[in-house]
């Protein structure tokens, strides 16, 4: 069933606990310093209320308590909208390249949970999603955020995700929106790990496999969560359309 986690995952887990402790100390201080800010938000991940922090060239992007960004807040809101406690308790989850805030959420509220990654050791199993080592109809929910832009044969990976889903199951497959049209590279660009720069047309690859694809837009949610990506300068990509405004979209694919 793929390579199981080594003991290195324990040490990584201890490091994360220390990291979360320090973040918990940071939030009250940041909130005090910026107490006069007119920009105050709610974080659906950790429950924090107050001003958000800047993240690189993104304004008011980061929660100072849990450290999560726009797409994490968006994911939590959409997941909670779809899965109430009763439905979650009957849902088997496969989490690929797991985010720690979602790992905790899934483990606490869902029927069963398996985390996976190609290289990381702090997961239950290591495997390549182009060949998922589970039988057909194994899961009700697959979550893989910002993964497919790294996968050489992404169409095969999408088929594998659909294969291990049960009928009616959902796959959450967000990718970065860098252009209107996806750019696939023949080789990985120098100094980059990605094999493609995904665009809004990328969701057509999901529609070719799944019966239904619902795209959640951050503008449909209350502004108090600050889900839109607000940039301070232009995005540098390999596309001529370098000033393309990045939408924080979340596609949910139904088998």
Residue ranges: model-predicted function:
Residues 146-150:
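A short His-aromatic
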Residues 122, 133-136, 151-155:
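Activation segment
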Residues 134, 139, 210-211:
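Conserved hydrophobic/aromatic "anchor" residues
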Residues 120-123, 139, 180:
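Generic "edge-of-domain/loop-turn" microfeature
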Residues 30, 34-37, 41, 152-162, ...:
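S-adenosyl-L-methionine-dependent methyltransferase catalytic module, highlighting the catalytic core
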Residues 143:
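A conserved beta-strand element that flanks and buttresses the S-adenosyl-L-methionine
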Residues 2-133, 244-252:
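Conserved N-terminal segment of class I S-adenosyl-L-methionine
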């Amino acid at each position: 069933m793929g390579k199981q986690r080594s003991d290195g995952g324990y040490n990584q887990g201890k490091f994360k606990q220390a990291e979360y402790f320090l973040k918990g100390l940071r939030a009250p201080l940041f909130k005090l310093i910026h107490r006069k800010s007119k920009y105050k938000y709610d974080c659906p991940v950790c429950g924090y209320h107050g001003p958000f922090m800047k993240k690189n060239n993104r304004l008011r992007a980061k929660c100072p308590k849990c450290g999560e960004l726009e797409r994490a807040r968006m994911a939590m809101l959409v997941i909670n909208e779809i899965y109430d406690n009763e439905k979650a308790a009957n849902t088997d989850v496969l989490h690929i390249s797991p985010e720690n805030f979602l790992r905790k959420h899934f483990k606490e509220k869902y029927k069963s949970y398996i985390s996976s990654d190609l290289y990381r050791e702090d997961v239950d199993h290591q495997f390549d999603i182009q060949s998922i080592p589970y039988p057909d109809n194994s899961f009700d929910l697959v979550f893989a955020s910002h993964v497919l832009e790294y996968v050489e044969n992404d169409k095969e990976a999408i088929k594998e995700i659909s294969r291990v889903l049960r009928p009616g199951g959902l796959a959450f497959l967000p990718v970065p929106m860098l252009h209107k049209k996806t750019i696939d590279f023949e080789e990985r660009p120098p100094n980059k790990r990605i094999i493609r720069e995904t665009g809004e047309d990328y969701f057509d690859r999901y529609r070719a496999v799944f019966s239904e694809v619902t795209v959640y837009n951050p503008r449909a949610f209350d502004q108090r969560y600050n889900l839109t990506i607000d940039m301070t300068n232009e995005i540098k990509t390999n596309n001529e359309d370098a000033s393309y405004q990045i939408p924080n979209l979340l596609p949910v694919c139904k088998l």
